[in-house]
Regions:
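Solvent-exposed, non-transmembrane regions of membrane-associated and secreted proteins
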Residues: 21-135, 141-148, 156-207
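Secretory targeting and sorting signals
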Residues: 1-26
């Protein structure tokens, strides 16, 4: 991640959550050939290249459309969330529906997929009201647009002051598929009109 990406992530974290940027990948410089290939060799190489591309064609992982957490009775469709004009992460517009941070990782891909949900509303408990009740080993099921599903297992649940949001743990790339569920928690600041902390669930994909 570039220095600019780190600065952007740190700034956005103050609003609740942060965005992530793609990690750069360096490609080695090709070595010069020892001699010029013959036409037969070139044709053979071209055929091999065509075969390589045909077998390695990229199929993107379908987007998530639903989250189910049986142990705390959560069953919600997923709104797609992006970034607000000030480049902070959008929060779900509906208190009873969770949202997936679409510029980030798709559940099932290597990296940290992030799903947000409100803890309560003026009407009462919201979609992630019971998030703190999750325990290590609980299942989180994600259904994708093509009808496939992937299951994650809760590893830990933490609470952080919003001014100390763990950007690295939530958004930075991981080698394996992981999932983060985020809601508000802690003490409610009546003057500011929001909670002082975030509750974050860390989960890994079940193989």
């Amino acid at each position: 991640m570039t220095n600019g990406g780190r600065r952007l992530a740190a700034a956005a974290a103050l609003a609740l959550l942060v965005g992530c940027t793609e990690a750069g990948v360096r490609h080695p410089e090709p070595s010069p050939p020892a001699s010029s290939p013959t036409q037969d060799q070139a044709a053979s190489g071209a055929a091999a290249a065509r075969g390589f591309h045909s077998t390695r064609s990229y199929q993107p992982t379908p987007i998530p459309v639903r989250v189910d957490i049986p142990s705390i009775h959560v069953a919600s469709s997923l709104d797609r969330l992006g970034r607000a004009p000030d480049r902070t992460v959008q929060v779900p517009s509906r208190w009873e529906v969770a949202g997936w941070y679409a510029p980030g990782t798709r559940p099932g891909d290597p990296g940290s997929a992030v799903i947000l949900g409100h803890v309560d509303s003026k009407r009462g408990p919201a979609v992630f009201y019971r998030l703190r009740q999750l325990r290590r080993g609980d299942a989180i099921n994600i259904t994708r647009a093509d009808g496939s599903s992937v299951r994650f297992t809760v590893q830990r649940i933490e609470q952080y002051d919003k001014q100390r949001f763990p950007t690295d743990d939530v958004y930075y790339p991981t080698l394996t598929p992981t999932l983060r569920l985020v809601t508000c928690g802690g003490e409610f600041d009546a003057t500011a009109g929001h909670y002082r902390s975030n509750v974050i669930v860390f989960a890994t994909m079940q193989r």
